[in-house]
């Protein structure tokens, strides 16, 4: 998984920067801690929209994992991790159009929509004007894509006693 995530980061960088990115890319342990940090904070929010117990990293796209790791950096007290988070956010933001263009089926996958929403959320709360403006311009798109995604819902029998 780390290799796929690193490849995603390397696809959108200048050739002269690749060696520095490879050396500075987080270890699997750090990525795991960032993902755990995200879920530990996400779970206690008033509106959690990712279900941590059913999250399986091996079944997610590298874009989604990078977006979650990016969100995990916001809870760290390290400027280095914050810088990493901004870089990861930019990689995810740039990779999403390519991902959706590569296969129309990806637009119907829940993890892809969750990646998109998380990328927008991170941009909105980044405090960087450029990132905030880009995220604001994309806020409507997940609502447009949502009807095409198959999301399992709990189906309750309708009983006349409920009315």
Residue ranges and their predicted role:
Residues 106-117:
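Amphipathic alpha-helical protein-interaction segments enriched in hydrophobic
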